Amino acid sequence: MVPRRNPEPLRFLPDESRSLPPPKLTDPRLLYVGFLGYCAGLVDNFIHRRPIRSAGLHRHLLYITAFYFVGYYLVKRGDYTYAVRDREMFGYMKLHPEDFSEKEKKTYAEIFEKFHPIR
């Protein structure tokens, strides 16, 4: 098992993550997790042999809200880990520019062959 980089017990997001913008409330990942909450309510009704779509609408709303809330923080954590990874990668690229040299840019005229229409 790989140890964590900065092991801090009971810390979901460090204070450093507060500088990142929050995820949008209409983020497709959040809407997908909310839909999974709705599906969890349907499965719960199916398991307990209740009418699948019509029984316990308050339970459906509870599942949707809970899944959406958890998904929000999971998306926020994912964005933070990607930001840390990007910062480390760009820092490495600044320290080792010889490994990431710029290639000479070619125009499309140099890449493609001459076009001769055939009629």
Swiss-Prot record:
Biological process according to GO: mitochondrial electron transport, NADH to ubiquinone
Basic and acidic residues compositional bias, start-end: 1-18
TM annotation in the entry: 56-75
Chain spans, region Disordered: 1-22
Record flagged with keyword Electron transport: yes
One GO location term (cellular component): respiratory chain complex I
Subcellular location per the Swiss-Prot or TrEMBL entry: Mitochondrion inner membrane
The organism's place on the tree of life at top rank: Eukaryota
Assembly with partners or alone: Complex I is composed of 45 different subunits. Interacts with TMEM242.
Family in the record: Belongs to the complex I NDUFC2 subunit family.
Protein name: NADH dehydrogenase [ubiquinone] 1 subunit C2
Source species: Macaca fascicularis
Gene name of this polypeptide: NDUFC2
